[in-house]
């Protein structure tokens, strides 16, 4: 709530997507839509993931196996930051659906964020197919551990219930 410019007011929709009055009966409400305006200028805590060189290139995004020698973000020489945006919130909501992240609230949130349960199934199928592909390519007797899978860019997956309308406006339904 502290990142919101003001407390969002829900808009209630019926089965056909029509806006309902605020005093509509609960039986008539099919969807609640929250439009959340974020305060501009909120920045991430300094972190090496945001560190860039003079040309604007990320310093530590291609470390590969060298990343294993660091046990703390504080060990990196350079730190950086950037503004928090509505796109970041959408990404984090999508992360709830990933089986790569332990999310104790997924079952609950799946009932409230449109498409979150479906996204969870899609991501599980994606990872299962990826594990099978890697196992086949490597000839291993066992599939790779989830922690050994390559990075999964959740921006490539749609979630109807969370949209960034612009950098500072988030819609959740």
Predicted segments, located by residue:
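The feature preferentially marks the first beta-strand/turn patch immediately downstream
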Residues: 1-173
């Amino acid at each position: 709530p502290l990142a919101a410019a003001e407390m969002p007011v829900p808009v209630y929709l019926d089965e056909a997507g029509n806006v309902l009055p605020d005093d509509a009966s609960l039986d008539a409400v099919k969807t609640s839509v929250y439009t959340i305006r974020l305060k501009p200028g909120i920045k991430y805590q300094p972190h090496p993931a945001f560190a860039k060189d003079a040309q604007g290139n990320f310093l530590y995004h291609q470390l590969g196996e060298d990343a294993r020698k660091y046990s703390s973000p504080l060990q990196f020489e350079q730190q950086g930051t950037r503004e928090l945006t509505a796109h970041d919130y959408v990404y984090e909501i999508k992360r709830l659906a990933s089986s790569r992240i332990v999310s104790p609230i997924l079952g609950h949130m799946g009932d409230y964020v449109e498409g979150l349960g479906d996204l969870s199934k899609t991501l599980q199928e994606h990872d299962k197919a990826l594990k099978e592909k890697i196992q086949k390519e490597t000839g291993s007797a066992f599939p790779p551990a989830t922690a050994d899978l390559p990075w999964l860019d959740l921006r490539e997956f749609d979630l109807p219930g969370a949209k960034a309308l612009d950098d500072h406006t988030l819609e959740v339904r």
